[in-house]
């Protein structure tokens, strides 16, 4: 069973390696608001495919990948203590107060606010880096993917 699972994995990795361009050492991609507004790179890896590919690369290299755990921590840290108190803490933060819920329904007319950039403090002149910037909005190399392994 392990051989039958390993063979398609190796074929997929070989195809990926042949597709990936070699990047110069030390090259860091930076994403600005303009980069994000232009959309994903034609050869970028985006969405749910990104953690899957990084996980596969890390497995092939014999390293671990904690991407899922990091995302889980971010989600749990977003639970507001006021929401826990409003619901008595009985649902573990899944329910929120009416005021908090209605705040998400306000109509926004500014496209920067609608995209979430203004709330996160992303400025037009300041860039940010990360796996989404490097591999979705830009084209990342195999070496850059390996850097996200443990």
UniProtKB/Swiss-Prot annotation:
One GO process term, biological-process aspect: glucose metabolic process
Location(s), subcellular: Secreted
Source taxon at top rank: Eukaryota
GO MF terms held by the record: hormone activity; toxin activity
Spans through the membrane: none
InterPro entries in the cross-refs: Insulin-like, Insulin-like_sf, Insulin-rel_pep, Insulin_CS, Insulin_family
Keywords: Carbohydrate metabolism, Cleavage on pair of basic residues, Disulfide bond, Gamma-carboxyglutamic acid, Glucose metabolism, Hormone, Secreted, Signal, Toxin
Modified residues (4-carboxyglutamate): 144
Tissue specificity comment: Expressed by the venom gland.
Pfam families the UniProt entry points to: Insulin (PF00049)
Signal peptide positions (record): 1-25
Cystine connections: 31-133, 46-136, 58-149, 135-140
Chief subcellular location: secreted
GO CC annotation: extracellular region
PROSITE patterns hit by this protein: INSULIN
Keyword Oxidoreductase set for record: no
Name of the protein described by the UniProt record: Con-Ins Im1
Lineage: Eukaryota, Metazoa, Spiralia, Lophotrochozoa, Mollusca
